[in-house]
Amino acid sequence: DEAERLGLDAMWLAELHFAPERSVLASPLIIAATIAQRTRRMKIGTAVQVLPLCHPLRLAEEVATVDQLSGGRLIFGVGRSGFAHTYATYGVDYGESRERFAEVLTILKRAFTEEQFSHNGRYYRYDNVRLAPRPLQMPWPEIRIAAASPDTYEEVGTMGHPIFVAARTGNLSELAPLVKRYRTAWKMAGHAGDGRGAGASGRACASAAECACGCSRRGRSGSPSPTHGDSRRWPYCS
């Protein structure tokens, strides 16, 4: 309630497991559903849901449910890496994370958009699946993909998804060539505009100009505070 009263545009929720020294929640969609019932305007985003650890159909149902409960305010931020010990604890091979991410994302999109579908993949197989409920936003809640490696920047740009940039260390200007690769791939794939993205860092900047001037401040909780919008407005995209 207070966050919306103060004018926040969005609230972002992480997924962290088995790390009590730094994690305050492990189930971002459950928290998102709670926030949705106490707010009316601001966006609610996951930052990020670790797809290789999720059952894709169950996740699709939960995402659609939260999108309905929030009146279409969900931003579905997704990622791959997380921490190797989390994968081991869940019994998932960390070396499979890239392939699992791609397969889960494919299943999610099909579940959101197809009336009925079957899937025969490496990790999951389904026959004649029909998702219920369906998300309110069409074709799906905005899917924002986290990127760290140069290859991922290009892949996300080619797919035409907004990007989530983690900038916890170093100078924001070091990200300029990576974001350029994202924007180049975006254009080469024929998508309109220059791409869109969010940056998660220890800075909570009122604007790109403020960031460029070196003015930074911690978020209210002292945790990383994402900013989002058109990639042309990012301070490291000039």
Segments predicted by a language model, with ranges:
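C-terminal amphipathic alpha-helical "assembly" element
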Residues: 1-8, 75, 165, 172-183, ...
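N-terminal beta1-alpha1-beta2 module of alpha/beta enzyme domains
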Residues: 1-38, 42-44, 138-141
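Short beta->alpha connector loops at strand-helix junctions that form conserved
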Residues: 14-15, 48, 166-168
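Acidic-and-aromatic substrate-binding clefts and catalytic sites of carbohydrate-active enzymes
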Residues: 17-26, 52-57, 170-175, 213
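Aromatic- and acidic-residue-enriched segments that line the glycan-binding/catalytic groove
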Residues: 23-26, 62-63, 222-228
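Generic alpha-helical structural context detector
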Residues: 33-37, 106-110, 222-225, 229
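Structural motif corresponding to the early beta-alpha repeats
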Residues: 45-51
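Internal, glycine-rich beta/alpha segment that forms the wall or movable "lid"
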Residues: 52-165, 172-180, 184-195
